[in-house]
Amino acid sequence: MNRSEKPQLRATTVLGVIRNGKAALGSDGQMTLGNTVIKHSTKKIRRIQHANLITGFAGATADAVTLLDRFDEKLQAFGGQLERSAVELARDWRTDKYLRRLEAMLAVVSADKALIISGTGDVIEPEDGIVAIGSGSMYALSAARALIRYTDLSAREIVTESLKIAADICIYTNDHIVVEEV
């Protein structure tokens, strides 16, 4: 890396699954700066009690925490309406001079909805009830789809096993897995 390049912060695989009226969201704990693992147990999952939701983030931690706080404010302002709050956050994120510089993505699950919220104004509700963000997201997503299709595992078990598979493949994902359930 030459002096003019900033080391790229890489971290996170976050995966959420809805199955049989239950939702689980989990993440690994690894944070990497450049080619170096700097932390093994980063907390990337947050439960929003008053709305019965679980959120997870990928990207810069300070940016993500700022966005999670804003999302919580939107949920309170809109009476816990998940989709409306997500759209309003995405709108603010895209148009606000300060917020649009934030580099993070959010994954949100409730017992019946799963959303990905991005800084480009996207609010994505996957058709299969699986959300995945971060460095190892495509590995975890692939594993989760296979486990849903070919097993009777619970949402929590699918998230856990899929994150383990991602950790075996992605160098930016570890096996210090935290899973929450609603």
Swiss-Prot record:
CDD domains: protease_HslV (cd01913)
Catalytic activity entry: ATP-dependent cleavage of peptide bonds with broad specificity
Keywords: Allosteric enzyme, Cytoplasm, Hydrolase, Metal-binding, Protease, Sodium, Threonine protease
Molecular-function GO terms, alphabetical: metal ion binding; threonine-type endopeptidase activity
EC number: 3.4.25.2
Enzyme class: hydrolase
Main location: cytoplasm
Activity regulation information from UniProt: Allosterically activated by HslU binding.
Subcellular locations according to the entry: Cytoplasm
Residues the entry annotates as binding Na(+): 167, 170, 173
Protein's UniProt keywords contain Acetylation: no
A cellular component term, taken from the record's GO annotations: proteasome core complex
Function field: Protease subunit of a proteasome-like degradation complex believed to be a general protein degrading machinery.
NCBIfam families: ATP_dep_HslV, PRK05456.1
Subunit structure as annotated in this protein's UniProt entry: A double ring-shaped homohexamer of HslV is capped on each side by a ring-shaped HslU homohexamer. The assembly of the HslU/HslV complex is dependent on binding of ATP.
Family classification: Belongs to the peptidase T1B family. HslV subfamily.
Protein name as annotated: ATP-dependent protease subunit HslV
Record organism: Prosthecochloris aestuarii (strain DSM 271 / SK 413)
